């Protein structure tokens, strides 16, 4: 049986994916009922409240967070220069913005939202269990000597391609936890070095993301007082990402961009295992319902969420099942199999997915530098082609027509997910590579 035949994928879609051709896929399941395990409104409110009551603690632990009072928040940057540079005139509709999670302090990526939330939830739970904090206790008490001594008896463990490990490692070690990060072969050397300077134990693996996560999960299962941050199934991570929705809503209101039937919101999100985009989409759907249209962006070598959503929902599927190799410069998105939690929720809520090859990643990275003055890592540039896919492709235009959407009335938010902590020499290498490829032919849209 040919590779991929048993996955219930449309043959044309399968052929496009196997040829590494950048593709826009529209989700026919959008609008289906949410699964029974979907988070509740109370869950979302609890996560937001946790981050707010712990803001003072974060500001005390990290000087970089003092200007925001300890809140995890990033700017919303207008992207008109990027819009004007779009290749096709018909792709220049609507208002474009970039959500700058690449600039999030301390962790330098979108993973600060979910990672910090999970570590804070763990710290609160331990402190309350041992009488170190109550419901009304100032959370700065979690940085006390007594709290640190208690946390030092516990281990926090995570499996990561890089950015989640940074997020978990930075906060857990700052609170006094013993911290272990299992890192895949895709993880960049500078990320591992940064963790080690913070006292985090880094365990390097020759295999991919899934193998690093599995190794961490198995080690944690045999250890007392060990909390494993499971990127493939953590509700705490998911809810932390979901809190970004209210932040974005306030920024759009301040920018004078309504979100309603006449003024739809399109959000374009880089996607690895699916937790971060899944959480953000879930939060936005809770606020805006059908008026938000979310598209996830994945490497052509690693479209794990697209494969899961387009195939049989009953069984987990891997990009290896369709003959792809999961090898990409987008290290943060080099994931072969989607999170079951995120995939089930995205199946009901995502508008679709599109894929981007490495040449396009570097072209978008260079556009971000030259048009907007933003230095990104390759994975963070994955979603920059989203607006052009919607307004400039046959499938995208069909999506707009089918919903009676006026492209000029839409707001497009492109999520930039990481880059501010990348060493300067790495940024120079990225940009030199992008300029070299542009000289020999550039990249497609």
Swiss-Prot record:
Organism: Burkholderia pseudomallei (strain 1710b)
Xref: Gene3D superfamilies: 3.40.50.1100
Cofactor(s) of this protein: pyridoxal 5'-phosphate
Lineage of the organism: Bacteria, Pseudomonadati, Pseudomonadota, Betaproteobacteria, Burkholderiales
Gene that encodes it: dsdA
Protein name: Probable D-serine dehydratase
Keyword presence, Lyase: yes
GO molecular function: D-serine ammonia-lyase activity; hydro-lyase activity; pyridoxal phosphate binding
Protein family membership: Belongs to the serine/threonine dehydratase family. DsdA subfamily.
Assigned EC number: 4.3.1.18
Keyword annotations from UniProtKB, A to Z: Lyase, Pyridoxal phosphate
Modified residues (N6-(pyridoxal phosphate)lysine): 111
Pfam families the UniProt entry points to: PALP (PF00291)
Domain of life: Bacteria
Entry keyword Ion transport: no
HAMAP family assigned: D_Ser_dehydrat
InterPro entries: D_Ser_am_lyase (IPR011780), Ser/Thr_Dehydratase (IPR050147), TrpB-like_PALP (IPR001926), TrpB-like_PALP_sf (IPR036052)
GO biological process terms, semicolon-separated: D-serine catabolic process; isoleucine biosynthetic process
Catalysed reactions, semicolon-separated: D-serine = pyruvate + NH4(+)
